């Protein structure tokens, strides 16, 4: 896909089984070189944990301010989450998130868990 210079953006419904199926089919059909996944930038290094064969949904990311448990946010993933399917596509297509022909980048929307 990189050779065409095109960018495709998929609008998805979080935790929507139909969105997850459609996204996985589109990624398989288009075979992109780069997959961008919206999420907290603090989780960039954690995405690679999805390569562990024991990591199976349901799973979640938890962001928090140490000592401030009320200042927390979480991002759940189920097998029918489009984000999970995008991560799994990337793993299946390249063998890992940091090597091979496919690059996965988590595009962050910073969680508002900072002190006010």
Region spans (language model):
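Compositional signal for N-terminal targeting/processing segments
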Residues: 1-116
């Amino acid at each position: 896909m990189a050779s065409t210079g095109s960018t495709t953006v998929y609008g998805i419904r979080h935790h929507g089984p139909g969105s997850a199926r459609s996204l996985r089919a589109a990624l398989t059909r288009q075979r992109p070189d780069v997959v961008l996944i919206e999420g907290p930038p603090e989780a960039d290094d954690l995405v690679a944990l999805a390569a562990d064969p024991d990591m199976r949904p349901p799973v979640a990311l938890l962001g928090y301010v140490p000592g401030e448990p009320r200042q927390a946010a979480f991002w759940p993933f189920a097998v029918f989450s489009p984000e999970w399917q995008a991560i799994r596509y990337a793993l299946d297509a390249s063998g890992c998130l940091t090597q091979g022909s496919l690059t996965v980048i988590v595009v962050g929307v910073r969680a508002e868990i900072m002190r006010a």
